[in-house]
Amino acid sequence: MFNEILKKVDWHGNMLSLSTGKIARNADGAVLASMGNTSVLCTVVFDKNTKKDIDFFPLGVYYREMAYAAGKIPGGFIKKEGKFSEYEVLVSRLIDRSIRPLFDSNFRNDTQVICTVMSYDPRYSPDILAIIGSSAALAISGIPIVKPIGAARVGIVNDEFILNPVIHDNTGVNELDLVVAATFDSVTMIEAQACEIDEEKMLAAIEFGYKSLKPVINAIEEIKSSIRKDIFEVTARPHLRYNDEILKHFSSDIKSALLLQTKNERNQQLQLIQQKVVDYFSSEANDDDAILNIEKALDDVKSKIFRDLVLQDKTRIGNRAIDEIRPIICEAGLFNTVHGSALFTRGDTQSLATITLGSSTDEQIVEQLNKCERQNFLLDYIFLPYSVGEISPLRAASRREIGHGWLAKKAIQLVIPSKDVFPYTIRIVSEITQSDGSSSMATVCSASLSLMEAGVPIKTHVAGIAMGLVLGEGNKFEILSDISGCEDHLGDMDFKVASTKNGITALQLDIKVQGINLSMIESTFRQAKIGINHILNVMNNTISCPKSELSTYAPMVQTLEIQKEKIRDVIGLGGKVIKELCKTFDVEIDISENGEVKVWGNVGENVKKAVQSIENIVFVPQIGDIFDGEVVKVIESGAFIKYVTGRDGFVHISEINDTHIKDINAHVKLGDKVKVKIIGIDHKNRVKLTLRTDKEHCKNKNEQYNDITTTTGSVKKKIKIAPKEAAVISNRKYFD
């Protein structure tokens, strides 16, 4: 019944299978890509009617993780998959950026790629399979693509390159997470996060991944040959006939406009030129389609003039040199009540970054198929419409904003201190207040500056730069440093590089041509390093090390360690004790299973008092210790005295004073403040107290114990803490 075609390939020790003809047969292309027990169904459908009223390729890519793939039922009130998670959006963009360069430049048909994770094996990540499956589905769909691609993940473990490293392999620390997509002869996409990898090693990793793809691409070609579907015919767009006329009459004006230094000046002049061009062809510009074709022809001419400037005159838009960085202005500490802030301006691109420090309760809980984790470092990128002088509604984060934010986060992640060193939750918000290209890399720079201004102990600055490419005939090309928005639009590449002074922390490559070779990547790295060093120098001149103190508006935290068996005493029955502490001192208390206690609060004095109260609760009482206590209950045979927070002891009527007492109520009343001494502890740890304290004995005890005095409400207590029960609090020793 099914005419299934199945290809299996041994890919560096892992069996990759590609199957088509069994599932989703109404799609133009459908491939089930599997490795281990991970399977991803990739489908492609395109509209057979070409859109004539647009000048872009309408491609939509959607990656979806179904809970059933991991044997789960979605959590929450509604037990089904909801909106796309950030991870799903990021993988969707990863696929899109890998396959978009493959399409014919004249193809303008609505195209949709859907990748669904059908089965999940924790050892194998489905994102690589989604890229491979999408490439295979496109190859058999009838869509005119240049050539199929493969994709691979590369890691570095024990200084060796690993292809598609197993996710939960604990044989060593992975210094690199690199994804490479490529055809037989060129690279189409790169995405990477690294631990300060030098440029030479990164290039070798890219080459390793690129050269590993041959078996995958061969398998896709074999499936394509087996199906032999007719290829959809694409016709050249009619705007091409306007090009020569525009070039002849307006090239000088266009060149002069492109050389203007500011974005606003250029845009104003180019808009005037556009109107002149439309007026020149007024006899033909009688409908929207004709105007669109004329505008597209003008865009082609701008691209040609831009390329001639770069390749022949060795200059570029804004009259800059090929490797020239736009003027940079850095400023740190703009707002007093914000925990940290910085403004980074590069040319007409500007990012305003702010830092907020929070407690462990502010951590982001992220649930994926394979894990549920808490993230204490958050970075949000917000692209504001006024940054490009436009009006648009403010909505939830777009796919582009999510992608740019995650790229900046990956670039900064390496320098963020561990929770052991800096226990705060860190949230960075980067608001793009001006934009003329490379706003994600401006975010990296502003985030790094704001972290130091906030006093977060990062070890060094991270800077980012966007590199461009202009291809000429033959092997001729030029690499551009710090591209503007117009250069991104007219050029062939947007290669974002983030790095410290020691090495690369993040990469992202997008291209508009069919691919680039390793020589171009090497040249990009070499030129990017020079640019990044320049940017780092400017940043270090503004602020070169973290502030020694946090903002007075930031929450304070103190950490102490208690014995595991004492955790229940701090929590209390039904959480009574910990709730009382939080309410009394207006703090948050976080207790881990290993006995680490963190106390958070906005008022430092309250945090210290809460810590002292916890110390009082967990201390080990010793016979002879003397305390200031409070009568909390009186019965016929004696009284119960609260001698520390959460601790009561019993005073028998015979221990009230040295005389015989007939009526205890005549001597002690509820709420009385009394001095008590421990005279006994039974096998159930019940404490027996006496009011008949010996002053001389008290003096001797003060020589053996350290005093800590704390106030809870109107109760003042002096606590005797034995030296052998030492606890470390914020690098200072107290005694428990």
Curated annotation (Swiss-Prot):
SUPFAM superfamilies: Eukaryotic type KH-domain (KH-domain type I), Nucleic acid-binding proteins, Polynucleotide phosphorylase/guanosine pentaphosphate synthase (PNPase/GPSI), domain 3, Ribonuclease PH domain 2-like, Ribosomal protein S5 domain 2-like. Residues 624-692 form the S1 motif domain. It is found in: Cytoplasm. Its EC number is 2.7.7.8. GO terms for biological process: mRNA catabolic process; RNA processing. Belongs to the polyribonucleotide nucleotidyltransferase family. HAMAP family: PNPase. This is Polyribonucleotide nucleotidyltransferase. It comes from Orientia tsutsugamushi (strain Ikeda) (Rickettsia tsutsugamushi).
